[in-house]
UniProtKB/Swiss-Prot annotation:
Belongs to the ATPase epsilon chain family. This is ATP synthase subunit delta, mitochondrial. Transmembrane segments: none annotated. The gene is ATP16. InterPro entries: ATP_synth_F1_dsu/esu, ATP_synth_F1_dsu/esu_N, ATPD_C_fung, ATPsynth_dsu/esu_N. F-type ATPases have 2 components, CF(1) - the catalytic core - and CF(0) - the membrane proton channel. CF(1) has five subunits: alpha(3), beta(3), gamma(1), delta(1), epsilon(1). CF(0) has three main subunits: a, b and c. Residues 1-22 form a transit peptide. PANTHER family: ATP SYNTHASE DELTA/EPSILON CHAIN (PTHR13822), ATP SYNTHASE SUBUNIT DELTA, MITOCHONDRIAL (PTHR13822:SF7). Its main location: mitochondrion. Pfam families: ATP-synt_DE_N, ATPD_C_fung. It is found in: Mitochondrion; Mitochondrion inner membrane. Keywords: ATP synthesis, CF(1), Hydrogen ion transport, Ion transport, Membrane, Mitochondrion, Mitochondrion inner membrane, Transit peptide, Transport. Mitochondrial membrane ATP synthase (F(1)F(0) ATP synthase or Complex V) produces ATP from ADP in the presence of a proton gradient across the membrane which is generated by electron transport complexes of the respiratory chain. F-type ATPases consist of two structural domains, F(1) - containing the extramembraneous catalytic core, and F(0) - containing the membrane proton channel, linked together by a central stalk and a peripheral stalk. During catalysis, ATP turnover in the catalytic domain of F(1) is coupled via a rotary mechanism of the central stalk subunits to proton translocation. It comes from Saccharomyces cerevisiae (strain ATCC 204508 / S288c) (Baker's yeast).
Length: 160
């Protein structure tokens, strides 16, 4: 009996200490540290930013410093990185975002391109071609075309 009372008491104390140290660590950081990586390059490496808006599977989310830790699957769409009054927008084909308790955000994506690098005319042509390939008799080609259509339609809606 005494052992269970001591065990519960120690457990409560450890929980309080853990919560308290988390709160102090969160208060100590001033901004969100962003790691934005692709397989072939790193776009941001521990850079301090104001906010990052993400196209998550659960809906669009905005991440600020001291955000609740989470892991999100990212859909094709725009990642907006806000640095003070400046904003940079990247179109990603998908990926993952992990928010750490110490105001760190790690975004990993297969591809990411600045929005200004896209041409509406090019997207329109690629989308028409992909839509033709969706009805292909080759199952693999049809599946790849369906993915292209999803990504290109998202990109086209962002560029309008």
């Amino acid at each position: 009996m005494l052992r269970s009372i001591i065990g519960k008491s120690a457990s409560r104390s450890l929980n309080f200490v853990a919560k308290r140290s988390y709160a102090e660590a969160a208060a100590a950081s001033s901004g969100l540290k962003l790691q934005f990586a692709l397989p072939h390059e790193t776009l941001y490496s521990g850079s301090e930013v104001t906010q990052v808006n993400l196209p998550a599977k659960s809906g669009r989310i905005g991440v600020l410093a001291n955000h609740v830790p989470t892991v999100e699957q990212l859909l094709p769409g725009v990642v907006e990185v806000m640095e003070g009054s400046n904003s940079k927008k990247f179109f990603i084909s998908g990926g993952f975002a992990t928010v750490q308790p110490d105001s760190q955000l790690c975004v990993t994506a297969i591809e990411a391109f600045p929005l200004e690098s896209f041409s509406q005319e090019n997207i329109k042509n690629l989308l028409a071609e992909a839509k033709k390939n969706v009805s292909s008799s080759d199952a693999r080609e049809a599946a790849e075309a369906a993915i292209q259509v999803e990504v290109l339609e998202n990109l086209q809606s962002v560029l309008k």
